[in-house]
């Protein structure tokens, strides 16, 4: 018995869509800790960094998790831990580049939607820079990366200022010939 195809049987060669969902959250370090706050590859001054072995970039981590749900390749908790332990690499941009490399040659990123929850830092002044950095790493157009932000209105620990949480939805097109 042959293994079932991961592609739908279509009358002509077609693209199918795969959707990955990612989430990550980290608590802030005490304000006297010198570790910088990094979100979407951008440093936010006057905000403490995150409790994490890496730089704690919850945006890049959520995107990595979304890639994992599309490619079935575990980036965080496996590859990232190996890079950190073996080479001392704590830059989440490196982990995200590995996630991008996990795509098959037949797969192409179509769109990335990100929502970030936290009372601080104020994201609006740096959302454009975050979008540019993400688009650069993912090698997609700027209009394919969208970021929204919410304070959480104090309803969650993130909205109360204890940390930052990020959710994202990654849409990947895959060419599946008949």
Swiss-Prot record:
Its cofactor is a divalent metal cation. The keyword Lyase applies. 4-CDP-2-C-methyl-D-erythritol 2-phosphate binds at residues 24-26, 150-153. One of its GO terms (biological process) is terpenoid biosynthetic process. The record marks 53, 151 as: Transition state stabilizer. A divalent metal cation binds at residues 24, 26, 61. GO terms for molecular function: 2-C-methyl-D-erythritol 2,4-cyclodiphosphate synthase activity; metal ion binding. Binds 1 divalent metal cation per subunit. Its EC number is 4.6.1.12. Pathway: Isoprenoid biosynthesis; isopentenyl diphosphate biosynthesis via DXP pathway; isopentenyl diphosphate from 1-deoxy-D-xylulose 5-phosphate: step 4/6. InterPro entries: MECDP_synthase, MECDP_synthase_CS, MECDP_synthase_sf. Involved in the biosynthesis of isopentenyl diphosphate (IPP) and dimethylallyl diphosphate (DMAPP), two major building blocks of isoprenoid compounds. Catalyzes the conversion of 4-diphosphocytidyl-2-C-methyl-D-erythritol 2-phosphate (CDP-ME2P) to 2-C-methyl-D-erythritol 2,4-cyclodiphosphate (ME-CPP) with a corresponding release of cytidine 5-monophosphate (CMP). Belongs to the IspF family. This is 2-C-methyl-D-erythritol 2,4-cyclodiphosphate synthase. It comes from Chlamydia muridarum (strain MoPn / Nigg).
